[in-house]
């Protein structure tokens, strides 16, 4: 692989443009043995050992994942998040001890993303079969996040389960993954029924 192709591949990562990618590639080339080789091996091992959880769609080394198999977690709470980074934000803050469901995105008419493109079809069954008493919809506050929230609420309405949404602390158009722990804690504690 030539250097320019590797720079182009790094540029596809979030937050990295051509200049940052070039600096990273040059650093890797200068530090082949102590940085590049362990990084390449780590990426290869990660690719081989990571599995998508068959229940919540988290990524882990086992399926079901360590969250879904943890007997200390509150199985009556189900927090639905857009992306894996949102789940990790909750876990990092240690502010939530229930179960998760990772959608893999949000509904978006403009982008052509419908319910069949997301991990949505198993939500009603999870709610019915696993003793869920409250579903917390933790999607972003932008239009697509709100539409997704409404769709989820309608899809489980017949179960009679309480459906809540994160409240204060999340700015309009904000992304959960970028919130600090205090803001996320405030939003979780002041969620409201939808």
Curated annotation (Swiss-Prot):
One Gene Ontology term from the biological process aspect of the record: DNA recombination
Domain Toprim: 76-171
Keyword Lipid metabolism attributed: no
UniProt-listed InterPro entries: DNA_Rcmb_RecR (IPR000093), Rcmb_RecR (IPR023627), Rcmb_RecR_Znf (IPR015967), TOPRIM_dom (IPR006171), TOPRIM_RecR (IPR034137)
Gene3D superfamilies associated with the record: 3.40.1360.10, RecR Domain 1 (1.10.8.420)
Zn finger intervals (C4-type): 53-68
Signal peptide boundaries: none
Pfam family, one: RecR_HhH
Keyword annotations: DNA damage, DNA recombination, DNA repair, Metal-binding, Zinc, Zinc-finger
GO molecular function, one term: DNA binding
Family in the record: Belongs to the RecR family.
Purpose of the protein: May play a role in DNA repair. It seems to be involved in an RecBC-independent recombinational process of DNA repair. It may act with RecF and RecO.
Stored PANTHER family: RECOMBINATION PROTEIN RECR (PTHR30446:SF0)
Name of the protein: Recombination protein RecR
């Amino acid at each position: 692989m030539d250097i320019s192709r590797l720079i182009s591949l790094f540029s596809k990562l979030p937050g990295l443009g051509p200049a940052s990618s070039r600096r990273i590639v040059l650093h890797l080339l200068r530090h082949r043995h102590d940085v590049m080789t362990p990084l390449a091996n780590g990426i290869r091992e990660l690719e081989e050992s990571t599995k998508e959880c068959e229940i919540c769609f988290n990524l882990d080394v086992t399926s079901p994942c360590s969250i879904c198999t943890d007997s200390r977690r509150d199985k009556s709470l189900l927090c639905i998040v857009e992306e894996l980074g949102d789940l990790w934000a909750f876990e990092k803050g240690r502010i939530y001890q229930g179960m998760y469901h990772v959608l893999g995105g949000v509904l978006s008419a403009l982008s052509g993303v419908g319910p069949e493109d997301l991990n949505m079809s198993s939500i009603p069954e999870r709610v019915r079969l696993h003793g869920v008493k409250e579903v917390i919809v933790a999607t972003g506050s932008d239009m697509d996040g709100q539409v997704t929230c409404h769709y989820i609420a309608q899809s489980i309405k017949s179960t009679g389960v309480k459906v809540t949404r994160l409240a204060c602390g999340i700015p309009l158009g904000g992304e959960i993954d970028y919130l600090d722990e205090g803001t996320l804690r405030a939003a979780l504690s002041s969620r409201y029924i939808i």
